[in-house]
Every structure is written in structure tokens, then in C-alpha cells.
Amino acid sequence: MKKFSPIMLLAGILVSSIAWSQMTLPPSGNNQKSEVTQYLGLVKVTIAYSSPDVAGREIWGKLVPYGLTSLGFGKSTEQNPSPWRAGANENTTISFSHPVEIEGKSIQAGTYGLHMIPGTEEWTLIFSSNTSAWGSYSYVPAEDVLRVAVKPVACEFNEYLTYEFIDRLQNSATARLKWEKLSVPFRITVPNGDELYIQNLREEMTSQKVFAWQNAVAAANFC
């Protein structure tokens, strides 16, 4: 029998891994990657997620159980049950370019893993510091940055899980998840939107824009 040295075996594994990492295949189960961005004044909010379809399945309370669930893998056990990943595949994430408020509760600028605990009358939204996990298999409460409670709302049928922004104002908007016949809205507010504009105007007044007198007048009128 021909023998292979450990170095040769390791080299073969590395070559195989590199070759596999370069493959781009269609998403399984129609879990299409999606992203939606909304500006609230100067503040950028982005939700990145995978979008599964209903495909004739019963979603709420069955495919997506109510409450916390032991997934039987990773850190998800009976002792440490998991919330829902709020999408499919890897973590759903939400990013804020500046500090904002979610349902009146403050959260700093940054990117967060978004998880949800579904309920028949109330849902809990979890913003986690872990943004690179696969779904909720590695979820631990110690990584929670913020939790807020919201009410689900019945809506028209949506085949694909979708996030969108509605009720948009200059410094606030409602983000919501929609799937099957249910939506989960949560309000995002910029508490200091005018202050951000004033700070931005001060910075612009040190640039070449200051040489146009119309810009100085516009800045003075706003302030």
C-alpha cells in the first residue's frame, strides 16, 4: 500500500479547501441573500439577511416555533435554548452608522446580530454583539446588547421573508419583517438628528464649500 506523509495529506486538504471556497453555488431552499438600506437624515440603517420562501409550509408556530427552542447543535441546548435567526442561513444583521433608539431604547452605532423570540401576542427582538454566527446555533444571552418587546401585526400574504422601512420621517422610520401573513414592526429613531446636521455643516464650512456665499446663508438659516 502506498503511504502518504502528513505534509502531503495536509497539502491535499488545503488545496481541496481553497478550491471549494472559490465555488459560488445557487442558494439552497430559495434562501436568497437580501439587503435593504434606509437613511434617516444622515444616519444609515442597513439590514442584511437571507430570504426564505413559504413554499406551502406552515410558518408561525411550526417551522418557526414560538418561544425559545433547543436546536440540538452548537451552543443551543435544553439549558440554553435559542431564539429565531430572523431569516435563514447565517446571522441576520442590522447596522447603524450613528447611535439610534429602538422602540425608545438607546443602542450605539455598529453592526448587530438580529434574533427574535416569536410569540402569539408579543415578540422579543434581540440585538447581539455576535454578527458572524451561523443562525442562532451559537447564541448566548451574554452577548445581548439590547432587547425590546414589540407586537406582531397581521398583513397580506408574502411568499418571501422581507424587511422594509415604512412610516418614514426625517429622523425616524419603522422597520418591519414580513413573511407569510404576519409582520413584526419596530420603530427606529435618531434622537439628535438636527445636531448631526449642525455638526456636519460646521465641518463643511471648513471645506471649499465655504467659498460659495449661498452655502453660508443656507447653513446660517438652518442653524
At which residue positions do the language-model features occur?
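Bacterial Sec-dependent N-terminal signal peptides
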Residues: 1-24
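Targeting-peptide/extracellular-domain and disordered-appendage signature
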Residues: 20-107, 113-223
